[in-house]
Amino acid sequence: MTENGHPHGRPFKLGDRVHIVDSRDRHYLITLQNNGEFHTHAGLFAHADLIGKPEGTTLALARGMTYTCLHPTLEDFVLKMPRGAQVIYPKDIGPILILADIFPGCRVLESGVGSGALSSAMLRMGAHITGYELREDFANRARTNVESLLGADVLSRYDVQLRDCYEGIDERNVDRVVLDLPEPWHVVPHAETALHPGGILLAYTPSITQATQVRHAMEGDGWILQRTMEVLNRGWYIEGMAVRPDHRMVAHTGFLTTGRWIGEGSRAVTPAQRERVVDSRDEPILDDEPVLEA
């Protein structure tokens, strides 16, 4: 497997993870092993049956059941990966990569690495991550999952330390601070010393009360562009001319709160102050209208 975590359509080989989809749209994730077997209610097949076969190979078993085999995407892996801690799900991981603006070479301080789902996504974007994690079993699981998905070479960009982020951050001039913690507002003062001016803090929190606490912690001088959002994911049923929203949707999982640090002593314009700004016609300037200097 290449360091970017994708086998580029090559045939299956020993040690590969394989995403299996049966004819009833049930999903499985296996690792190809010597003498391994995949057991189902419709029978079994040997892992050796897939070695050397191309991606998209479909195996037929009893009762008309078929099993299509693919290299897993990042989404497939996150949903089926071994875990100790609760993971951040794909519907939030995608927006996090955009809101935190993760880029190749980005220096990230991540606290609360959990099972490594978000770490894997940021590493695939080319980030260099220093992770703080309290529990050794979670840290080991995160390293194992990252290596399993992205290969051993990526571990040179992934340094997970047994540290308590509430007690401080040693790193300086980092680009991003990404938090998945019960009380991330306690880390905001430490992020102020860790981030360079223009850096971004992002906190993932399950409850709006937690998100509110983070926002309150970022009300001081030096923080701008604070915002909080959640992502709701609703699929659609499309069959012929029948089109409707799915009866089930992936609704609330967590809140994403971000802010940019511009440096101690810098005073941001507050929302209340923005509302008092008027143009020459005494009309409020809307947030989505450009402000032109004379």
Task: Give the residues covered by each predicted segment.
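N-terminal auxiliary segments of SAM/dcSAM-dependent transferases
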Residues: 1-71
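Glycine-rich helix-loop-beta junction characteristic of Rossmann-like nucleotide cofactor-binding loops
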Residues: 98-103, 169, 193-194
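Short beta-strand element of Class I
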Residues: 127-132, 201
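Conserved SAM-binding loop and adjacent beta-strand
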Residues: 8-10, 80-94
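C-terminal substrate-binding/active-site "lid" region of AdoMet-derived donor-dependent transferases
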Residues: 185, 190-255
